Amino acid sequence: MKINTYELWSGADKSSVTYTAYLVEETPDIKNHNPRPAAIICGGGGFFKITDREKEPVALYFLNKGFQAITLDYTVGKDSSYPTPLYDLAKMLLVTREKAQQWNIDPDKIILIGFSAGATHCASLANRWNESILQDYFNYPKEKIRPSLVILSYPLLDFSYQYDSVVADPDNQRPTKLSPMPKLDFLTGALKTVVGKELIRENLQEHSPIEHISADTVPTFIWGMQNDDCIYNNALLDYAKKLKDNAVLYELHMFAMGEHGLSVINQNTQTEFSDYKELAIWKKLCINFINQVLDLN
């Protein structure tokens, strides 16, 4: 296997945006004639950082399932308001398709896998790949930045719903399991980072993924937990309903118990093997969905 890290954009102002490609190569002992599907992985971190737990461990899992894997360190922090991360993901799709032959990738089978904040960005591209905000910026055929499908792990999909819910929550001063900050400060801070403007209705809706679902949204797999203490997950049900209303192929798995940030739920991601290891079934369900959509069987 070959592992290399590259800058996504040319220019010093974008040097922090990198990607790492994990590529299985053909050797005398490993025949790898057929192009592989590719998985572009976007970890989460509240829009402030990207956790290692949702990068290489995920890449290794999908490598073992027959994919070439790429982890993307998209823009985070003070410069990461929309549409900047959307541009990062679209650029990663372009680069992957440009290098498809070199990397032994099937350009028609490139998926996005996102976790938490990274899943928010993946959902945005799944919905907006053919919008003018991207077409005007890249001036490429729109199909070049269309993912084949997206996998959304405990995503934040409706900014207005999250804001309204945390403001109204009588328990919003308690910390979450992933942050010592009060939940109100944590969630509104994350929303301010990604929205980049005052948290009023118009601004929250402008780049909220749920507002951009259409009949052109790509097939979507979603999983989350009812008792997730970082976000309010009823929004996943609303999102799935809107996918259905637009005749978009989707699958939703809402587990009763679990924790935000579970990733692939194995010894590479848990300091103590999780109490929720039975939720690792999401990976099998996800692979089944991918196989059906991409006809990989």
Protein language model features and the residues they cover:
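N-terminal cap/lid segment of alpha/beta-hydrolase-fold proteins
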Residues: 1-34, 201-203
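Short beta-strand element of the alpha/beta-hydrolase
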Residues: 35-44
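Catalytic nucleophile-loop/oxyanion-hole region of alpha/beta-hydrolase
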Residues: 50-52, 70-107, 272-279
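Short amphipathic alpha-helix adjacent to the substrate-entry channel of hydrolases
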Residues: 52-70
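Primarily recognizes the serine-hydrolase "nucleophile elbow" in alpha/beta-hydrolase
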Residues: 94-171
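Conserved strand-to-loop "acid loop" that flanks and positions the catalytic carboxylate
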Residues: 155, 221-229
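Mobile cap/lid helix-loop segments that gate and shape the active-site cleft of serine hydrolases
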Residues: 165-212
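C-terminal catalytic histidine-bearing segment of alpha/beta-hydrolase fold enzymes
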Residues: 221-223, 234-297
